């Protein structure tokens, strides 16, 4: 409500909540920090897990930051911004989601200290932007260049990513699967590797143990052969991929045929049968002995395919058809009549196998397949879900290193190096912006501090020790949470991709700056649900629900 010549002027609807200036900033910072604190205890190899129970009673137990934030139902807009940080980090780098969110939360905490000293948000924003830009330069400078073909380095990267997750006890196997899968689908363009992770399929099947998980150099499809008389195993398979139903096509118009005699009916049925037989005859003439169809297969067509000894699978997902094409070299045809021998793909074996009581189709032994499947096994659904999350992170970080050829020591070492160098940079910049740069540098120490805290170590003592040793022994010194002391992360093979760290700092600083720019929050009154009681805005932000 505003006033003009002593008369009140109503601008916003009744019930609207408005927070201006410091109130808006405090509430947004508080919401963002709550999100950061929620995931902070999951950071690092000694991080704890979260149990998430949805409205249907489904349970997820994980310490994966992206999964946790994706499953939590949030209402507060600033909290949702923090979730976007995690999503961006996951999309761009594949790992480091918790790191990005924790740094963003700490940057906002340190910004609040400056706001309390009456430093204007614009000055803090400028200082943070300068610090973030300088941090990117420093990371590029301290990064260690590696050979993308060096399997040992790739295995270390994958193992570091899996460490601390529930699947850690099988990290050697899972790291090996991740590296082999990425190397198989990687393609060189202009002398650099390009990896499309869409070409790696994760197929989960509860049963057996995690150690039974395997890499299939081809495609595994959760389908079965359509006809009992068809072969269940075909060697030297010539594979046809058809994006058309093997059925009699229905007319687009509502045409009607008047049949007045049994002969006409017989003739009509014979014509339908001939059309289906011609389709199958054409497939057989190309030399195909395995057919994958994206749509349906008529019962009669199934019968003729079985007579020819052709294995057929129907209603295959489009994504699986594309992977089959990349694995076998087959071309997807949209019209059976257009199918030629040149369109067929090859696999040494196509076989229907029973796993955990269900039939699955294995397409294996492809010549240099550019699509592969990681078959995940485990005792329960919870186990295989966690293994899948671990493998997803692992293949992403291996992709990062193969594409960029650069790594950093882990264990908080890069953050310590950045904190030291940004402190020096702040002295060069001078002015009030220097205070923001110093606070940015100090905020980065939250990563080594949290690693120590989650490992049950004395955080103050450990931070002093690790910074001192880092200055004396070099940038590889971080916190070894297993031995509870500073150690050279490079010597121990505890490394992470440069891309992960750069993106984490970029995402965190951008989110913090975006939240600091907000000085006015206008929250509309919640509408009443149909047939239920209203009640305005629930509590949490004085009218804005924290959603937790």
Swiss-Prot record:
The keyword Transferase does not apply. One of its GO terms (biological process) is protein folding. Residues 531-548 have a biased composition (Gly residues). CDD domains: cpn60. The keyword ATP-binding applies. GO terms for molecular function: ATP binding; ATP hydrolysis activity; ATP-dependent protein folding chaperone; unfolded protein binding. It comes from the Archaea. InterPro entries: Chaperone_TCP-1, Chaperonin_TCP-1_CS, Cpn60/GroEL/TCP-1, GroEL-like_apical_dom_sf, GROEL-like_equatorial_sf, TCP-1-like_intermed_sf, TCP-1_chaperonin, thermosome_alpha. Keywords: ATP-binding, Chaperone, Nucleotide-binding. It holds the Pfam family Cpn60_TCP1. Residues 527-548 are annotated as: Disordered. Forms a Heterooligomeric complex of two stacked eight-membered rings. Belongs to the TCP-1 chaperonin family. Molecular chaperone; binds unfolded polypeptides in vitro, and has a weak ATPase activity. NCBIfam families: thermosome_alpha, thermosome_arch, thermosome_beta. This is Thermosome subunit alpha. It comes from Thermococcus kodakarensis (strain ATCC BAA-918 / JCM 12380 / KOD1) (Pyrococcus kodakaraensis (strain KOD1)). The lineage of its organism: Archaea, Methanobacteriati, Methanobacteriota, Thermococci, Thermococcales.
